């Protein structure tokens, strides 16, 4: 954990692998592991306020200036850029998209591509065997 110009309220939990800069964390708040308080915008430093008994999910990025109200939650992996009012849940993360065959097309000849090729071949063999047993 790294703290810079931060005030941590009594009973608040701020675990390892967390950076808290230019922030106030309310009493009883819980900051998930890997959370980053992104306080510098390239020009100046901005403040983040986390309310009492708020819960910040692991690996959240709080982009200052931002405020989480008392009892507010954020979902793990979110990038929070706007206020999360008291008692609300802030979710800000993109939907996962898997680009089929990306490694084979873009990383040909690498160990990753070779491993993926073997795994996909094994999956296809299993699928063929499974389909064959259904028709018998």
Task: Describe the residue ranges of each PLM region.
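Glycine-rich hexapeptide-repeat left-handed beta-helix
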Residues: 1-132
């Amino acid at each position: 954990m790294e703290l810079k110009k931060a005030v941590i309220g009594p009973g608040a939990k701020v675990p390892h692998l967390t950076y808290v800069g230019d922030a106030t964390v309310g009493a009883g708040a819980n900051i998930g592991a890997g959370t980053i308080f992104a306080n510098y915008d390239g020009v100046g430093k901005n403040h983040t306020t986390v309310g009492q008994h708020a819960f910040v999910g692991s690996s959240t990025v709080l982009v200052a200036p931002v405020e989480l109200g008392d009892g507010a939650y954020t979902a793990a992996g979110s990038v929070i850029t706007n206020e999360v009012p008291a008692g609300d849940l802030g979710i800000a993360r993109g939907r996962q998209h898997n680009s089929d065959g990306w490694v084979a097309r873009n990383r040909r000849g690498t160990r990753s591509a070779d491993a993926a090729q073997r795994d996909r071949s094994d999956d296809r063999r299993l699928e063929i065997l499974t389909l064959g047993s259904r028709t018998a």
